[in-house]
Amino acid sequence: DNVRKSFELLIEFKEDKYEKLQKNEEYINYLNKNIVDFTTNAISTEFPIEGSQTIGLFLKISADIERIGDHAVNIAQRAELLQSEDRRFSHEAMDEIGIMSSLCVNILDELRIMNYDEFSSIVDKVDVIEENIDKTHHQFTVNQLSRLKDKKCTTENSVVYTKILTDFERIGDHGLNIAEGFYKAREAMKAMKMIEHQ
């Protein structure tokens, strides 16, 4: 939700939406802290090695989710900066940012799985999107350098644009990490016979 909101703030900055995003981030951080506390206690108890590894995987997944939230906040803060300085991106730059945002939202949508059977194909699905994000990030960086060279944008806006692209690219990386974590957790649970082999 925060990833979507961060892009919406770039289109039109609204203080109430920005505050809601910040509150969401505080809740994400709260959940992450509680997950860390719970998993640390669970790992310290007498667990079979596979169980400890599975708990460790969920701990890493939680950390990746928290990092996605951080990148969404980064984008929102950049939107606030543009608003406060009355600066705007070109239509072309906004279209490119919109494409990066959509690709990231696609990854996050893929990660909303309802049962363990879906874990088996999640890495392949997310990997395709994440690879597309990397290629798109590269192409849009080239486009931006061209705009800068042709004096179609300011240096200040170019720096902010590049940081936003990087935030979206990192969101894709963390999304792939989560997909891989889900798959490994499923395999570990199968090994422990916590779920049926498919």
Stretches found by the model and what they are:
Residues 1-198:
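Cytosolic, long alpha-helical scaffolding segments
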